[in-house]
Amino acid sequence: MATLEQKLQELVADPIDAMGFELVGVECQRAGRFLTVRLYIDKEGGVTVDDCSDVSRQVSAIFDVEDPIADKYNLEVSSPGLDRPLFTLAHYQRFVGREIVVHLRIPMLDRRKWQGELVSVEGDLITLKVDGNLQAFAFGNIQKANLIPVFNF
């Protein structure tokens, strides 16, 4: 059974692509009775506030017609930002060599949070170098992962 995030992604990915943007990912977060639906978009050269506004209007129109969400919700459209979330294996592959933080569904070695250099992606295994040691994680056990921003002054 598809999650709400997967259903929404299927619904809006093609229209967003037709507008010239990549749908990086969808997050749904509940706070009480309200749901926040967060869409991350990107394109070559980055996205502007106007781009986010245009995509928000298009997606709102789609949601009005298709009515995929039963609850009250807030729609947020933004760029992935410097701490870009990683949603797919292709995202991990793209950022091999970068520092990331990973939050696991099921702890490994009594830890849920791991930070290190993304060394490789093989099949559904993500390998990080953590404190000089290699540690592999099953993609399915990763609840959330983000790039660690690099600031060069």
From Swiss-Prot:
One of its GO terms (biological process) is ribosomal small subunit assembly. It is found in: Cytoplasm. Pfam families: DUF150_C, RimP_N. InterPro entries: Ribosome_maturation_RimP, RimP_C, RimP_C_sf, RimP_N, RimP_N_sf. SUPFAM superfamilies: YhbC-like, C-terminal domain, YhbC-like, N-terminal domain. The keyword Membrane does not apply. Keywords: Cytoplasm, Ribosome biogenesis. The keyword ATP-binding does not apply. One of its GO terms (cellular component) is cytosol. Required for maturation of 30S ribosomal subunits. PANTHER family: RIBOSOME MATURATION FACTOR RIMP. Belongs to the RimP family. This is Ribosome maturation factor RimP. It comes from Glaesserella parasuis serovar 5 (strain SH0165).
